Amino acid sequence: NKANSKAYKPARERITQLDINWNIIAWPGLAWAKRMFPDLAEDDAQARLAEAIFMASRVNEEDPVASWKTHNQTLKEKREWLNQKDFKEIHFKGPGTDLKVGLADDHEWMGGASMAQNGVICNPNIPSEEVFTTPHALRVEGYVSSTKPLSHQGTLIDNIRVVFEKGSITAVSYTHLRAHETS
C-alpha cells in the first residue's frame, strides 16, 4: 500500500545501494504450507515446507557456508558466460508462452552474492538460483501465461495472461482472483 511504501522508502534506498547488509529468507506460513501439502496436518505441512526451504537454502549441508561459496562461484561463472555472449534478446517458449524480450544496450548480467559498502559479501535472497539483467523497454513482443498461481500482497491470482507489443502491455486476463491468509 502507499503508506507502507512511503514509510519503507529510506530503508529500501539503503538496501538497493548496498549501504547495509540485508537478506530475505523464506519461512513457511500456515496457508502456504497447506497449499503445498494439502493432505498433511497443519503442523506436518509446515514442517515439510520448512524442510524444503532448508534444503533449497543449503542449511542441511555439512558446511552451509562452504556450500554457499561454491554456489556463488557457480552463479558468478553463469553471469560471466552470459555477459561474454552479449545476447540481444531472450526468447521464452512454453505452455501458453511465446515471448521475445530484447535486452538493453550495454546490459550486464547480475545475481548471487553482492558486496555491501562495508566490504562484507552478502546473499540478499536465500534461497536463490537467479541471475538477471535489464530488458529493453521497447523490445518486448508476444505473450506470457502463468502456470502457477501468483501471490501478490495477500491475493492469489490464477491463469494470468499478458500480451506485449513494442514493449507495452496490450492485453491482460486472468480467470481467478481471491484473497488468502498469509499466516
Segments predicted by a language model, with ranges:
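Active-site bordering "gate/hinge" segments
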Residues: N1-E141, S183
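Tryptophan-anchored aromatic micro-motifs
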Residues: V144-S145, S173
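Short, basic/aromatic recognition patches
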Residues: K148
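Metallocofactor- and cofactor-centric catalytic cores in central/energy metabolism, strongly enriched
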Residues: H152, I157-N159
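Short, acidic, Ser/Thr-enriched surface-loop or helix-capping motifs
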Residues: F164
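Conserved small/polar residues in nucleotide/adenosyl-binding loops
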Residues: T175-T182
